[in-house]
Amino acid sequence: MILDADYITEDGKPIIRIFKKENGEFKVEYDRNFRPYIYALLRDDSAIDEIKKITAQRHGKVVRIVETEKIQRKFLGRPIEVWKLYLEHPQDVPAIRDKIREHPAVVDIFEYDIPFAKRYLIDKGLTPMEGNEKLTFLAVDIETLYHEGEEFGKGPVIMISYADEEGAKVITWKKIDLPYVEVVSSEREMIKRLIRVIKEKDPDVIITYNGDNFDFPYLLKRAEKLGIKLLLGRDNSEPKMQKMGDSLAVEIKGRIHFDLFPVIRRTINLPTYTLEAVYEAIFGKPKEKVYADEIAKAWETGEGLERVAKYSMEDAKVTYELGREFFPMEAQLARLVGQPVWDVSRSSTGNLVEWFLLRKAYERNELAPNKPDEKEYERRLRESYEGGYVKEPEKGLWEGIVSLDFRSLYPSIIITHNVSPDTLNREGCEEYDVAPKVGHRFCKDFPGFIPSLLGQLLEERQKIKKRMKESKDPVEKKLLDYRQRAIKILANSILPDEWLPIVENEKVRFVKIGDFIDREIEENAERVKRDGETEILEVKDLKALSFNRETKKSELKKVKALIRHRYSGKVYSIKLKSGRRIKITSGHSLFSVKNGKLVKVRGDELKPGDLVVVPGRLKLPESKQVLNLVELLLKLPEEETSNIVMMIPVKGRKNFFKGMLKTLYWIFGEGERPRTAGRYLKHLERLGYVKLKRRGCEVLDWESLKRYRKLYETLIKNLKYNGNSRAYMVEFNSLRDVVSLMPIEELKEWIIGEPRGPKIGTFIDVDDSFAKLLGYYISSGDVEKDRVKFHSKDQNVLEDIAKLAEKLFGKVRRGRGYIEVSGKISHAIFRVLAEGKRIPEFIFTSPMDIKVAFLKGLNGNAEELTFSTKSELLVNQLILLLNSIGVSDIKIEHEKGVYRVYINKKESSNGDIVLDSVESIEVEKYEGYVYDLSVEDNENFLVGFGLLYAHNSYYGYYGYAKARWYCKECAESVTAWGRQYIDLVRRELEARGFKVLYIDTDGLYATIPGVKDWEEVKRRALEFVDYINSKLPGVLELEYEGFYARGFFVTKKKYALIDEEGKIVTRGLEIVRRDWSEIAKETQARVLEAILKHGNVEEAVKIVKDVTEKLTNYEVPPEKLVIYEQITRPINEYKAIGPHVAVAKRLMARGIKVKPGMVIGYIVLRGDGPISKRAISIEEFDPRKHKYDAEYYIENQVLPAVERILKAFGYKREDLRWQKTKQVGLGAWIKVKKS
């Protein structure tokens, strides 16, 4: 049995090593005769002699082709002749391949990126895990004093536990008197003992849970610090760490390091993937969790070490049990795809399919297509296709429900209609299958490459399932089940209204992404490139806010292109705990953190409780801001700027304007040279229009000078002398068409205002006084005809407003509860700058002190900001502004059309990115354009309500953007047929008296109204399955999945059912996070039971009312009110002081150590102020002294847990609360809809 394969180098040549188990013994086989190679397709075979001469350099060594061979292959089913180019060493391939590809005679090169040892297994037809050898297993787990946020490997390893079929043991270096504990003298001796244990037991498989990213990297770090070589390999080598995507992977030579964590993440869907949660989900048994702070306390004090040792032992034991449960399926997958378990267990489904296809392609003499380069990959990512059909659920409580499901719908469609890249639109075929709606044709004259392989897989799976039914041997049954599950794994493998901040010409503005891209594409239609249905507009002067995934720093990056394409399918409406939200397709991703690494997570992969990256601190360009008042006035209608004048003192300018115009006429050859022309020529030179010569001047820009002449002609025509002010005066409206032509140097000399009113300069320096006044206006100001009013009940605030306004505009009027500033200029400034109560764009790029002053005016206190508005735009602007000064602790609430934004403390965030958790996900149907930006380097951008970082992604194998056999037409054809067949089933069902309650892609739920005999419903459903299967083509098959006594459907992906044995099945309704109290979880469970088991909605409502009554009357025991939240970082890094952080701080004040990983349990008390000030630990709670906050638990715990269920029956939140006056509930009129 082959366990693994690699290669080593001797004398510059590669030697393949095959690690095997044979007749119970471990052995290594060597092959010195296998050489690396690539394929090259040439335009002209005569060029092969030139190709042979190509050389490259690798570490000072000359790399060259050592042998060539012309061979016959097929490419996408068509015969092709290619050259096989042999090289001396596997590392020669990346060194020389680009030079070969760049030769003019080379069309392309192929199969140059298949690792050498994997290539060997494929070419030699060797299959890992084949045979009946008995493997030995050992699970390993460690306990450390490391805490998240500390230097990795700084704290010691305090316990190492291991488990095998003989039992579990713990090694430690503190005295613990337990039979399974071995005590050594030091950490160093403990690690050396582990090395001896592994050598003595000599396991074939070492099982860990997150050993790739924690246990082994940590052990390696500690061993290095302690001067030990961690020699665990069968070749006496140390574990080898390597990067694998966003994570690490650890290899132990000669042994299979089987890390359960990636396997379980790929295999089962859970709300959390702690070892305890996984064990309970798989085996149905709870496992105690001992938290990091408890371990640290026990180690420091010596009290409770026995509990920690037991926990460590159970970790190893549980890891061993889980490993034995999951390893057989991974072994079967390894046999199927022909690659070692180490690789298979760390591969995505897409990669598993790829390895399977590569092996089968070699067997069939097919040349594998290349993976896409970055440009092609980006193009594929922009492509989209309509997904499966989803029917909106029928509301209400239903009985007698059958579940029908297509067996392997998409693989069956691929086989039935021969959907494959090599059959797509193939010319000269006698028979084609044409995909509905999309119209792609697939040749039926020969079996396609992928359909034929899928056919074999599904046929094999059906044979196995048949053998499972016939087998009496439980061991054989289990092995067969693992194989059929492995086959199943292999066989199935941003919207217009979102807010987008963009930076253009160093100015920040918010746009709706759809409106913006639509307008840009329509206005620049001649520059738009089309790739299928995708429209791409390349842009130059646009920037987007993004972050660098390596440095985790905010960056302002160029936008390379605006992109849109048609889409019809699912969109995911994602709401975060902070109140942020976004709608994305399953082809777009947000960013999350897994195992300390940033990773992309698609919309269809996210689930409540997941962490999502949002901005903590944003870097915007900052500079001193100056407002041009003339530009503001030009934005107003002409009637609103009537009676506004511009003035300039006469002193020093007598006859200047006439003299300048005469000089300009002379320059243009339309008059004589004025006697005083020199004065005006010097002025024109200062402005950059001319260059003075000994006799006259040289005009540098005739067009600009012509416009300048037009300005002066208009000035002379309209200029008047005002004797009282000894100034020239001109009406602003008379200059509207030309005032923008006035050079800034001249414009600065003018003042502006009403003839008899105060005047101000044409340029306003944005200082902290002006910024604060703007903040006051947005918060409480309004404009009327020719006046601005600021309102406040606080006299101190009014006095501050008055002082700031007088500084800029002169005298103000004080009224009761308001300050009034009269005049058209003040009206114009606030009307234009803050139109619609938005934050002026220049505030975002102002220096920090200006932003802070603005926020103080907006809220009166920038330290603890609270702000309410009905404007989505203003909410987004405010969040961007707060992020730009480093404030990330932001919460958004929305109630009755009003948004409320608040922060707990204005402090700088320590990081440019922070994490927010997903609160809810709604799936909706959408048809129309979806939009995207291509952003330089980072390929992510800030978008959505409340601002999140978004990125593109992919789904499906044919639609998997990195796939070699990528085929967008195949993917959209498969889903089109899928929609057609599920709709056919729906129509046929309804024609036979069934009512379809809900459809999602490949399955549906239905009942027969009026039929009370459930056996008849089942019988008719089974008859229908036989009938429809007789009509379905090919291998398509509808299956009877089960029967449910009762159920209800809230929205898509949210429903609850109960089977005949009383087992409740829910989807999308569960509350499983720690921050739900027991009373909330218990109430939801009782509500589901009342509705599903008893069929009584009114009983469910009564349960809720009873609970709210008990809460109101303080009759709920405190242990049911505890809310648990985990400390995820050092306390001093928290900017938002949530209740768990506040409690943690009080614990620290009492001398209790609080570190990341510690879970804080707290109860919220009655009282005023934020809940962080009213939360106390469960240990502190004394029922004689304390009263919990009943309103908090009703509104934030119990009602949210049940509201999502009962709204399906027409109930609103207010219907569910206990009230002293008895009311009749809606349930009195809701009848169970029986079959």
From Swiss-Prot:
This protein undergoes a protein self splicing that involves a post-translational excision of the intervening region (intein) followed by peptide ligation. The gene is pol. The lineage of its organism: Archaea, Methanobacteriati, Methanobacteriota, Thermococci, Thermococcales. InterPro entries: DNA-dir_DNA_pol_B, DNA-dir_DNA_pol_B_CS, DNA-dir_DNA_pol_B_exonuc, DNA-dir_DNA_pol_B_multi_dom, DNA/RNA_pol_sf, DNA_pol_B_thumb, DNA_pol_palm_dom_sf, DNA_pol_type-B. GO terms for biological process: DNA-templated DNA replication; intein-mediated protein splicing. Its EC number is 2.7.7.7. It is an enzyme of class 2 (transferase). NCBIfam families: intein_Cterm (TIGR01443), intein_Nterm (TIGR01445), pol2 (TIGR00592). Keywords: Autocatalytic cleavage, DNA replication, DNA-binding, DNA-directed DNA polymerase, Nucleotidyltransferase, Protein splicing, Transferase. It catalyses: DNA(n) + a 2'-deoxyribonucleoside 5'-triphosphate = DNA(n+1) + diphosphate. It comes from the Archaea. Belongs to the DNA polymerase type-B family. The keyword Membrane does not apply. PROSITE patterns: DNA_POLYMERASE_B, INTEIN_C_TER, INTEIN_ENDONUCLEASE, INTEIN_N_TER. Pfam families: DNA_pol_B (PF00136), DNA_pol_B_exo1 (PF03104), Intein_splicing (PF14890), PI-TkoII_IV (PF18714). Residues 773-887 form the DOD-type homing endonuclease domain. One of its GO terms (molecular function) is DNA-directed DNA polymerase activity. The keyword Nucleus does not apply. This is DNA polymerase. SUPFAM superfamilies: DNA/RNA polymerases, Hedgehog/intein (Hint) domain, Homing endonucleases, Ribonuclease H-like.
